[in-house]
């Protein structure tokens, strides 16, 4: 009898939720990566509108917290919905939603609470910010997770819409009337995503095929995917010249970033290219690209106001 109590205690400890489990459920890395564009959108709105940074801190912090919650909630709901296919893919079989360490009911409750509280915070800033945040939730959960991910080869492109929402949320929190610069941030993030996610999909093409997810590399193959990646990278080339408000230095530096990615994309057409190695190089470059691009926006905008 005593041994049974001990065994139950051990199992309880083993199943206790850890911070690592929470990170996996809400996809913390993805959330953190999207906070940089959200902050950059808000910062550029502050600088271009002539508002004081200090007076904008309440809206800025509320926006960042609300955005964190709606993204975390959306990702948790994605984990809830994708349990069946995640259990098939080796890279995702250790997720708490798959192992059973966290019940499906708990994941669903967590996701709904996070999204509701996050939306409430965004609506306290202004109506526009709340609506844009809701569009992000709808796009990721409904248009991507439920509708396109399992049925359309264009799922990555459709998923790029909600993925490009963060800078708009940030900008609207400070200036509800979105400027052309705000929309360009949206366009750039939209264009950036296919090449980024196709690179990862090349490495996991067999997994996606096993799970029946029609990702481009799994359906059309490597040669077709690298053409698509080159196309999307090329679309980035003119974008800096639509952001003249940020100055010549920014346009030059952003163009250098774009050209570097273009050269890397072209290198994928070599006859002796190692597909997975090239894809991961593209993936890493895309991550650095996004971080450098938005940090550069903040720095350049700050310098202009000094």
Curated annotation (Swiss-Prot):
The keyword Transport does not apply. Pathway: Porphyrin-containing compound metabolism; heme O biosynthesis; heme O from protoheme: step 1/1. It is an enzyme of class 2 (transferase). Carbon 2 of the heme B porphyrin ring is defined according to the Fischer nomenclature. Interacts with CtaA. Belongs to the UbiA prenyltransferase family. Protoheme IX farnesyltransferase subfamily. Converts heme B (protoheme IX) to heme O by substitution of the vinyl group on carbon 2 of heme B porphyrin ring with a hydroxyethyl farnesyl side group. PANTHER family: PROTOHEME IX FARNESYLTRANSFERASE, MITOCHONDRIAL. NCBIfam families: cyoE_ctaB. This is Protoheme IX farnesyltransferase. The gene is ctaB.
């Amino acid at each position: 009898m005593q041994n049974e109590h001990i065994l139950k205690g051990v199992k309880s400890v083993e199943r206790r939720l850890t911070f690592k489990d929470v990170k996996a459920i809400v996809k913390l890395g993805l959330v953190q990566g999207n906070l940089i564009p959200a902050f950059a959108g808000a910062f550029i709105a502050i600088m271009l509108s002539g508002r004081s940074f200090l007076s904008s801190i309440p809206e800025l912090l509320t926006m960042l917290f609300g955005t964190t919650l709606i993204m975390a909630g959306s990702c948790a709901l994605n984990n809830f919905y994708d349990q069946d296919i995640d259990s098939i893919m080796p890279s995702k079989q250790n997720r708490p939603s798959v192992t059973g360490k966290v019940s499906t009911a708990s994941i669903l409750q967590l996701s709904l609470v996070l999204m509701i509280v996050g939306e409430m915070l965004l609506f306290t800033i202004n109506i526009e910010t709340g609506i844009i945040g809701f569009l992000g939730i709808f796009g990721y959960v409904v248009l991507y997770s439920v509708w396109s991910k399992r049925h359309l080869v264009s799922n990555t492109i459709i998923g790029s819409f909600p993925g490009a929402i963060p800078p708009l949320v940030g900008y609207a929190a400070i200036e509800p009337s979105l400027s052309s610069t705000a929309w360009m941030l949206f366009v750039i993030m939209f264009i950036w995503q296919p090449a980024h996610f196709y690179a990862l999909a090349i490495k996991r093409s067999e997994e996606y095929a096993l799970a029946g997810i029609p990702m481009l590399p799994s359906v059309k193959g490597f040669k077709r995917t690298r053409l698509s990646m080159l196309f999307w990278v090329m679309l980035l080339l003119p974008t800096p010249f639509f952001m003249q408000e940020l100055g010549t230095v920014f346009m030059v530096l952003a163009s250098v970033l774009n050209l570097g990615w273009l050269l890397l994309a072209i290198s994928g057409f070599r006859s002796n290219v190692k597909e997975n190695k090239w894809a991961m190089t593209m993936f890493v470059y895309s991550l650095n690209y996004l971080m450098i691009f938005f940090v550069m926006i903040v720095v350049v905008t700050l310098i202009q106001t000094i």
